[in-house]
C-alpha cells in the first residue's frame, strides 16, 4: 500500500546493502529532493527546529534499544513479557473495543507488495514502543512537567504529577502513550467506577491477585498517562 504515492515501508536485503549501502536510501532521497524543490529549496524536515541549542549532543550515557525486524514474526511474546514486568493492566476486550487499550508495547503490521498480485503480498511486523526521542514533542506540551527527559536520554513519567490532560498522548507521533480511564489495578477507592467492568479487570483488584505484581514498578492510578520506561528498574539493577 502507499500514502501520497509513497510506499508504507522501505525494504532492502542485507546482500544488496553490503554491495551498495546507498541503494536503500535512493527512493527516500529522491522524494525528499522533490519536497525541497517544492518548498523553495529549504529542507524543513532536516533544518527547521524550535529547539535551538537543545539539538546539540550532550555527554554521557544514552540508552537505546535495537530491534531486529528481520527476525520478528509477530508472535507477541515481547508484549506479554512487557505487560508482566511493568504491571501493565489487562483491561479486557470490551475496553480495547472502546480504544482504552493499555499496552506499552504493540506489534504493528504492514502489508507490502503489488496490490494486483495477491501472491506477492507480504506482512512486515514492527514492534512499536516509546522511542525516547532526544527532543520529545510530548515533553514541551505538558503543563505540569509530568513527562521529562533524564540525563541518560530516557523520556520519563512522573505519575504523581500527571493531571491527565493527555496533551502528551496527542502530541506523540508514535501513539504509544496510554491513559488510565479507570482504576484497573489495585485501587479500591473508586467503587462506582468498577460496576460495569469486565471480570478480568475485577480479578486484578483482588488482594491475592495483586501479589503477582512486580514490586519494583509503580502501579498506576486512574487519570494518569503511562508508557514504556525502557524497563528503567532493570537498567538501575544492572548498574
Regions found by a protein language model. Name each.
Residues 42-59, 99-141:
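Active-site-adjacent "gating/activation" loops or surface patches in catalytic cores
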Residues 69-72, 132, 222-225:
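Short, solvent-exposed loop/helix junctions and linker helices
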Residues 73, 77-97, 106, 135-161, ...:
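Iron-sulfur cluster-binding cysteine motifs and their immediate structural context
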Residues 182-198:
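Internal, charge-rich low-complexity segments
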Residues 59-70, 121-130, 147-157, 210-213:
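Glycine- and acidic
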Residues 106-126, 193-231:
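Surface-exposed acidic, glycine/proline-enriched linker/cap segments
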Residues 1-64, 70, 81-84:
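Long, contiguous, secondary-structure-rich segments that constitute the structural scaffold
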